[in-house]
Amino acid sequence: MSDADVSKQIQQMVRFIRQEAEEKANEISVSAEEEFNIEKLQLVEAEKKKIRQEYEKKEKQVEIRKKIEYSMQLNASRIKVLQAQDDVVNAMKESASKDFLNVSHDHHVYKRLLKDLIVQSLVRLKEPGVLLRCRKEDLHLVESVLDSAKEEYASKVNVHPPEIIVDDVHLPPGPSHHHGFFHHHAEAHGPFCSGGVVIASRDGKIVFENTLDARLDVAFNKKLPEIRKWLFGQVAA
């Protein structure tokens, strides 16, 4: 084989190797591009999924905040309604408390009422001796009905008339324009007393508060569900 033939054969082999190498390189390039595209697609999809999840999370948070805000507004509205209802009820109680002033100012009516309150208190305690406390301005009226009250009690329960000692310490005076009507629990018997009596056993272990204010509290609290139903069409919880 001549040198020319050898050279020609070598060139053919080189071209073949080069062509094969280029084909392999193209295959690798195509394969790499496909893998890159797949990875890129996966990354894009993963990022899309992440964005969707973030959006859904934020959307849920917004919904939760809306529900919380709505609940807070609803509760605030309910509190305002309840406060307005309480204001109406308290105004009724204040009006009733003011009416007691007229009762204590009518000495003839109030004198009879004081006697009834004393008898009722004696029946409740059923003690042979008691201590009575009243307002200073009621002292003369109380003293004027003590004997008849003791006799009426003794006749009712068939016992001897009890010994009643009028306490030197008096209940607070009647309310004036300087006092509110609903702060009467701030002191022992309140800063004011609309009238009535407080009777205790001699040892002080049994105390029956039979003041007009205490009677109003008992009656009002007892009737409060009916009052609320009448005013607002519902029974208080």
UniProtKB/Swiss-Prot annotation:
InterPro entries: ATPase_E_C (IPR038495), ATPase_V1_Esu (IPR002842). Coiled coil: none annotated. It comes from the Eukaryota. Pfam families: vATP-synt_E. Keywords: Hydrogen ion transport, Ion transport, Transport. Signal peptide: none annotated. GO terms for molecular function: proton-transporting ATPase activity, rotational mechanism. One of its GO terms (cellular component) is proton-transporting two-sector ATPase complex, catalytic domain. V-ATPase is a heteromultimeric enzyme composed of a peripheral catalytic V1 complex (components A to H) attached to an integral membrane V0 proton pore complex (components: a, c, c', c'' and d). HAMAP family: ATP_synth_E_arch (MF_00311). Belongs to the V-ATPase E subunit family. This is V-type proton ATPase subunit E.
